[in-house]
Amino acid sequence: MPSIVLKKALIFLPVIGLYFLRSGAIPITRDQGINALKKMGRNAKIAVKKNRSMMIFPQGTRVSPGVSSKEKPYLPGVFFLYSQTKVPVVPVAHNAGLIWPKNSFIKYPERLSSKSVTLKILPEIQPGLPKKEFLSRLETEIENASNELIKKELS
């Protein structure tokens, strides 16, 4: 089970919040800036020592299909984790936004002909890249693959 980096407010949700806590989630308070990053880094190092993978949305949240990374850029937190933990990053593209809209707990599988979310596991990015190169590669690979999955589902 991966340690999921998530906004702290999610741990207060009934049932699922307890699940997040018990599963080793890494809650962060977004408005705490550098302190949130430091805490996230400490918890991420603990997760790595326990041989756990981590999951983070690089834009800090789920993003609706069609919203460009220019409108909702990739945030430095994902690079911070990458640089602090020194482990490979495995980018994952998906088309979940088509059936699970942002700001909604309700899912709409009938919107897709396949009735299911498709994930595409992309080649891992080895540790050690400079920030600009890492973020550029991560963004390009995820955005291209996600757009391809969305286009395929809608065609």
Regions found by a protein language model. Name each.
Residues V15-G17, K49-M55, S64-E133:
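A cross-family acyltransferase "interaction/gating" segment
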Residues M1-G33:
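Catalytic core of membrane glycerolipid acyltransferases/transacylases, capturing the structured
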Residues I46-K49, G97, K120, L129-S155:
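Membrane-interfacial terminal anchoring regions of lipid-handling membrane enzymes
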